[in-house]
């Protein structure tokens, strides 16, 4: 048993980063460690319900200074449009005095961070360990370390040439609006910290992890996916209305589509998507947010669509219980955006997987799973990012048709990978070993 430690956490102020950091904080608290979690004031209310150990995890609100481009009252990445997140970076960069004051007062053993480059330098001044914890994929971290890969030109020693952005993706899906200055700052944090860690596992991204270790010249620690307990293992059951509806179809025949609560289609692409689902001729259930500029999903549906598909298709506005739906025997295919949670729910299900990625990290993971591991397929898109109803229909049918060669290939590969991922203790073992490694780091610091 290692020494109990006190950790600071200073994640990027986006909910897609703060929530995974809180999952890790819960794991540390479960093992008896204390966490001081830095966050903007307005995030406190949304994150509080996810804090499973409020006696051990203390939220410490920070006040962002005014900077150019940061609207009054904006404190998180979701307060700014996707095209311009830089003001949050600049504001977080200016919080060093507030963080240092807390370090002096509370004397932590470790500080976790992801994007703020000066944390390792500050930690060294105070004799504490800096842990760079990346919740983006190893593919994305590797691309940050080899920025030409972001432009579609990975270096010769890049381990997986297929896992890079191409064509329109290098512009449309660029990580931070093509800001090489930000790439440089993130790289500085990765190379100067004491410990590099990523929310992934060797079974998915082993080769890329090796590349990152080589580039950073230090051992890489992996936490595994660090997901909260799945609903289908927590005693919950699928709502009766969905269970009854799904029971009306043959096993493995229903196509389930979900894109999370943070993604919004353009209206014309949403209508094309719906028409593609109709063209398939298969039963389907779609969980989606209203497209941009539309007050409701129903208002945005193609004319006459609901009437034509009412016996075999539902478009539902908002969130559904994904893991419970995926475990229903009637569901045979999962179409999603390759968001982190949906990606993992795909991999541990028995469903065929179709991806329509939207962001850079999602595009890279889709390439890994589709072209390298061949456990999924993706919908083909034009240079603008547009996909047609025929593209969607053909992609889904390629994995749903019994005689499809590609469908049988990805099904075999997916089954094999799933058996590995769900083997007892594999994923939970990553988190346990990660915490043990941190305890050793802290012990070595105390007795050095």
From Swiss-Prot:
Keyword line: Glycosyltransferase, Transferase
GO molecular function: UDP-glucosyltransferase activity
Stored InterPro entries: UDP-glycosyltransf_plant (IPR050481), UDP_glucos_trans (IPR002213)
CDD domains on file: GT1_Gtf-like (cd03784)
Keyword Hydrolase: no
Coiled coil: none
Record: residues binding UDP-alpha-D-glucose: 261, 320-322, 337-345, 359-362
Name recorded for this polypeptide: UDP-glycosyltransferase 79B5
């Amino acid at each position: 048993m290692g020494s109990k430690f006190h950790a600071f956490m200073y994640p990027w102020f986006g909910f897609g980063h703060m929530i995974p950091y809180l999952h890790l904080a819960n794991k540390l608290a479960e093992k008896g460690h204390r966490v001081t979690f830095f966050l903007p004031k307005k995030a406190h209310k949304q994150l509080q319900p996810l804090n499973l150990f409020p006696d051990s995890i203390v939220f410490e609100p920070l006040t962002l200074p005014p900077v150019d481009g940061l609207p009054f009252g904006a404190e998180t990445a979701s307060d700014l449009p996707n095209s311009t997140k830089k003001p949050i970076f600049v504001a977080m960069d200016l919080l060093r005095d507030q963080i240092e004051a807390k370090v002096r007062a509370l004397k932590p053993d470790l500080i976790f961070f992801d994007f703020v480059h000066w944390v390792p330098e500050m930690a060294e001044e105070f004799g504490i360990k800096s842990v760079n914890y990346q919740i983006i994929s190893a593919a994305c971290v590797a691309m940050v370390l080899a920025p030409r890969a972001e432009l579609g030109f990975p270096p010769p020693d890049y381990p997986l040439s297929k896992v890079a952005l191409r064509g329109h993706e290098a512009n449309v899906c660029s990580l931070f609006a093509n800001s090489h200055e930000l790439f440089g700052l993130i790289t500085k944090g990765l190379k100067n910290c004491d410990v590099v860690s990523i929310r992934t596992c060797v079974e998915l991204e082993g080769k890329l992890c090796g590349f990152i270790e080589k580039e950073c010249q230090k051992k890489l620690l992996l936490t595994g996916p660090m997901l909260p307990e799945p609903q289908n293992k927590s005693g919950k059951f699928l709502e009766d209305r969905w269970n009854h509806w799904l029971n009306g179809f043959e096993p493995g025949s229903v196509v389930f589509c979900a894109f999370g609560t943070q993604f919004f289609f353009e209206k014309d692409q949403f209508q094309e998507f719906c028409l593609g689902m109709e063209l398939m001729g298969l039963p389907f259930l779609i969980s989606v947010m209203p497209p941009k500029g539309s007050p409701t999903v129903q208002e945005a549906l193609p004319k006459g669509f609901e009437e034509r598909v009412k016996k075999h298709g539902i478009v539902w506005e908002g969130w559904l219980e994904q893991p419970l739906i995926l475990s229903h025997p009637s569901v045979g295919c999962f179409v999603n955006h390759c968001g982190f949670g949906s990606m993992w729910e795909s991999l541990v299900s028995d469903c065929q997987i179709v991806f329509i990625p939207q962001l850079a990290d999602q595009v890279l993971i889709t390439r890994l799973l589709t072209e390298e591991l061949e456990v999924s397929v993706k919908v083909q898109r034009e240079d603008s990012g547009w996909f047609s109803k025929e593209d969607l229909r053909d992609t889904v049918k390629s994995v749903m048709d019994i005689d499809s060669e590609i469908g049988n290939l990805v099904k075999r590969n997916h089954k094999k990978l799933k058996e590995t991922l769900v083997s007892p203790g594999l994923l939970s073992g990553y988190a346990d070993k990660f915490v043990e490694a941190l305890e050793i780091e802290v012990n070595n610091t105390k007795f050095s």
